Amino acid sequence: MVSYEPMRGMEDYFDVDSKIIRWIESNFRETVEKAGYKEAMTPIVEDFELFSLKGGEELRNTMYVFKDKGEREVALRPEITPSIVRLYLNSLQHYPKPLRIFYIGRVYRYDEPQQGRYREFRQAGVELLGSDSILADIEVLHLLENFYRRINLKDKISLKINNIGIFRIIFNKLSFDEQVQEHLLHLLDKGKIEEAEKILDEKIRDNSKIRQFIYTLITNGRSLKLEEAMREAEKTELSELVNEIENLKLISEILSSLNLDHIVDLGFVRGLAYYTGPIFEVVKRDLPFSIAGGGRYDSLVEVYGGNRTPAVGFAIGIERTMYALNKDGIKFDSNAPLVAVVALDRSVIPHALSIVSMLRDKGFITVLNNKEIPLSKLVPLYAEQGFTHLIIMGQKEITSGKVTVRNLVKREQITTDVKELTNVITAPDK
């Protein structure tokens, strides 16, 4: 017998939960469109190589990967940024830069399901391609602040920020190849500090200022102050390192000016392999997972064979944001009128339908009654379901050109002209 449960790690949503998801999406869309971002829609199914080219074959264990009927190895997308880069390379390179893109869509990861972690979930995000200015990083962070302020979560979240470019510069100076770099960053992302230190011990034999600095970042990055980090970076005589810390300091100052709570964690890295500069995550103090994240990725377009195109972006987890809203006790039940139109006999159905259409055109949620039971039993049924008004149509109403309105909240009934119907429905309940 077929199971009625959704697949493990996937969820069904109905009514209020669906409304919350759409509400989050709508607020996100309005926020980013006002900032000049244009929507992109890409397929859920992509060539597996699109993700493995930068992320490596080990991604296979955390993805839905399969062969299609043409024996092509394809995957359900685990994120959307690579798809946006593919779209850019395929058809958007001629657009003026910077190019501002946003997306909303479902993604799939074969993770072990747990609180806040799903195998199917929704992401909404932005990508800004074609600018290496720190102003681009500030723009997307400001946009993130705008969105969470719009949905009344700004004062309940905090940003964790760093600049992964600091690690990249040090690793490059130490001549670590890309595979070693990504492995070290993966270990740091997973909190496996001792394993990372072991690799560094094997590869760095001297006791240079660079070695001291990287060990300080790994073991003491969270508590390391930017001013202290700047002094230590200057000792390495790597000017690029100083520049990256200065960029991070500017971002922190901008976030402070926006009154957005944040911490600078110089040991913080993110798991995605393509980040090259400032990175960030949004956390809520009472949740064990982040609800959004992003950063700069200046080399990803080149990885896919394009010209160097600096880029920065972020993605929010829609279900995680919904969880944060629910956990905070924010209610979404609408106080808008909910109307049922009752035709007392079949001869007045055309007139009842015209009333239904008129009310829907005016923006009211309106249904045509299809319960063929006495009116005396309809009233309590609709009241129990949360309806606010019954519009009753019979031969008497047709003849008089009026309608009978039953207010289920105030338990009152009046007769009114059709042209006054919307005013009667929207009158406040005292």
UniProtKB/Swiss-Prot annotation:
Gene3D superfamilies: Anticodon-binding domain, Bira Bifunctional Protein, Domain 2. Its EC number is 6.1.1.21. It catalyses: tRNA(His) + L-histidine + ATP = L-histidyl-tRNA(His) + AMP + diphosphate + H(+). One of its GO terms (cellular component) is cytoplasm. InterPro entries: aa-tRNA-synth_II, aa-tRNA-synth_II/BPL/LPL, Anticodon-bd, Anticodon-bd_dom_sf, His-tRNA-ligase, HisRS-like_core, HisRS/HisZ, HisZ. CDD domains: HisRS-like_core (cd00773). Keywords: Aminoacyl-tRNA synthetase, ATP-binding, Cytoplasm, Ligase, Nucleotide-binding, Protein biosynthesis. It is an enzyme of class 6 (ligase). It is found in: Cytoplasm. One of its GO terms (biological process) is histidyl-tRNA aminoacylation. GO terms for molecular function: ATP binding; histidine-tRNA ligase activity. It comes from the Archaea. Belongs to the class-II aminoacyl-tRNA synthetase family. This is Histidine--tRNA ligase. The lineage of its organism: Archaea, Thermoproteota, Thermoprotei, Sulfolobales, Sulfolobaceae. The gene is hisS.
